């Protein structure tokens, strides 16, 4: 892959410049604490930890982002706030006001890298937003099982299927359990202690 379109390269370049900027400040946020960069119109280099993004209207989780990452670019100058960011673990980050970030990106010719980061953000967020609007419990469960199956093996083996689905949807635990039992009975999936260990082709 061309290094100019490699998201990891773009994150590295942008994050290094944010950290070096004299106007950036370092912050540590505890697990469960909100990160107010969207409300404060800021961007941040997430140096360590994991953050989750939630819809304001109902608190549903729409995405999870691991360090290293540049966060906040997709929400700069939002007219109506729709999401908030919360720390899933203790996080450390370098934070910069968006207006200064704009000047920095221009001075250091970082706009192409910023574009790749925003594009990646939209790519991972929009499909997950669609999951929330599935019409039936079966559709919701199946789509989330596919998403879990796409995770790396270590993360998949530690992901609770019920927590994963319930945190992202207004759906009852009993409805999820019913679909899971049906899928297990038909041989489409295999579970072990609430974790997904096998996923076959599901219509």
Regions found by a protein language model. Name each.
Residues 1-33, 39, 70-71:
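Cyclic nucleotide-binding regulatory module and flanking cytosolic helices
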Residues 48, 56-58, 76, 96-98, ...:
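Surface loops and adjacent helix of pleckstrin homology
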Residues 112-170:
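Polybasic "coupling" helices that flank or enter modular domains
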Residues 26-27, 35-46, 62-63, 85:
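His/acidic/aromatic-lined binding-pocket segments of jelly-roll/cupin-type domains
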Residues 42, 50, 90-92, 195:
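Structural motif
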Residues 147-203:
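Phosphate-/nucleic-acid-contacting segments
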Residues 40-59, 67-69:
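Glycine- and acidic-residue-biased ligand/ion/polar-headgroup-sensing regions
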Residues 62-118:
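Cyclic-nucleotide recognition modules
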């Amino acid at each position: 892959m061309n290094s100019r379109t490699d998201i990891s390269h773009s994150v590295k370049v942008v994050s290094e410049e944010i950290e070096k900027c004299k106007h950036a400040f370092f912050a540590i946020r505890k697990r469960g604490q909100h990160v107010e960069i969207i409300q404060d119109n800021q961007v941040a280099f997430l140096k360590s930890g994991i953050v989750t993004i939630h819809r304001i209207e109902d608190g549903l989780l729409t995405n999870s982002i691991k360090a290293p990452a540049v966060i906040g670019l997709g929400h700069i100058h939002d007219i109506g706030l729709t999401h908030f960011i919360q720390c899933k673990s203790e996080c450390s980050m370098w934070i910069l006001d968006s207006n200064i970030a704009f000047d920095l990106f221009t001075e250091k010719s970082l706009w192409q890298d910023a574009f790749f980061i925003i594009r990646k953000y939209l790519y991972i967020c929009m499909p997950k937003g669609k999951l929330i609007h599935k019409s039936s419990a079966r559709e919701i469960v199946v789509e989330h099982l596919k998403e879990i199956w796409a995770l790396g093996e270590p993360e998949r083996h530690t992901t609770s299927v019920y927590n994963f689905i319930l945190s992202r949807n207004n759906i009852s635990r009993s409805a999820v359990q019913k679909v899971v039992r049906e899928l297990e009975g038909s041989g489409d999936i295999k579970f072990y202690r609430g974790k997904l260990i096998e996923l076959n082709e599901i219509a």
